[in-house]
């Protein structure tokens, strides 16, 4: 599992876009513990907590060297598959795909799809409740091979039903990149994010869904869009993100250990 830190390139998106994949690959090839042999073929498992979704395509490029195309299970209030000329169209030159404005927190899955990093017809959005610029948004999303589960669906299906839909669609052997935007959680519970949307899931509901999809073959994950400047004095957003990260990591370890995960030494989770 990748361990390390990466410097940010504020306002130099084109640099981050080109350099981050190499850094993640290099970090992922390191030995995961002192006696382990370093990997030679790339990043086997990659988990990050970046502040922005601009990091996601880099992780998918790094994982692509080991797994090829991966399915994406994307928890978010928003699609994030917009064509750059549509989101936001005001300052994008549609004739120049090398513009750094093509690479935003709402276009990164469009970028990843165009680079053939995402396994089509195996990828899922969950928790959606975004406003659309038009019906074309969903049509473009469908054309990229995504299935959508709306935030409201949890009222009818329950957390277990949402998890079952994801598992049934993706399967348990397909390599999966799990991407979690903190704005999946309702803005009243996790206000510290850049694009909050009311009417989201509770933290408990998201955690129940994540536990329900433990059977997925998760090879990479992120928890993104936490903005401490907008968090409350109780830091509820940061706490929620930390718990979500804990759930993801423990689920990955649990699957990796299999039966070996039983009977381990108990540890305290509080001082």
What positions do the PLM features span?
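Conserved alpha-helical scaffold segments that buttress catalytic/binding sites
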Residues: 1-271
């Amino acid at each position: 599992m990748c361990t390390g830190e990466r410097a940010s390139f504020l306002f130099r998106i084109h640099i981050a876009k080109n350099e981050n994949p190499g850094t993640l690959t290099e970090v992922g090839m390191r030995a995961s513990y002192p006696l382990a042999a370093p990997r030679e073929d790339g990043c086997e498992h990659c988990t990050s907590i970046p502040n922005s979704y601009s990091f996601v395509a880099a992780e998918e490029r790094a994982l692509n060297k080991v797994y090829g195309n991966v399915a994406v299970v994307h928890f978010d209030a928003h699609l994030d598959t917009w064509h750059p000329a549509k989101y936001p169209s005001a300052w994008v030159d549609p004739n120049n795909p090398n513009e750094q404005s093509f690479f935003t927190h709402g276009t990164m899955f469009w970028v990843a799809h165009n680079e053939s990093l995402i396994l089509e017809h195996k990828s899922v959005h969950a928790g959606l409740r975004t406003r659309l610029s038009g019906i074309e948004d969903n049509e473009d999303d469908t054309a990229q091979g995504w299935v959508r589960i709306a935030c409201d669906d949890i009222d009818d299906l329950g957390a277990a039903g949402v998890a079952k839909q994801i598992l049934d669609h993706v399967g348990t052997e397909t390599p999966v990149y799990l991407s979690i935007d903190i704005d999946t959680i309702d803005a009243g519970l996790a206000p510290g994010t850049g694009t909050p949307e009311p009417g989201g899931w509770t933290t408990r509901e998201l955690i129940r869904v994540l536990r329900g999809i433990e059977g997925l073959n998760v090879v990479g994950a992120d928890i993104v869009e936490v903005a401490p400047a907008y968090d409350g004095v109780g830091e509820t957003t940061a706490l929620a993100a930390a718990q979500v990260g804990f759930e993801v990591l423990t689920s990955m370890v649990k699957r990796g250990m299999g039966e070996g995960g039983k009977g381990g030494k108990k540890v305290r989770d509080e001082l």
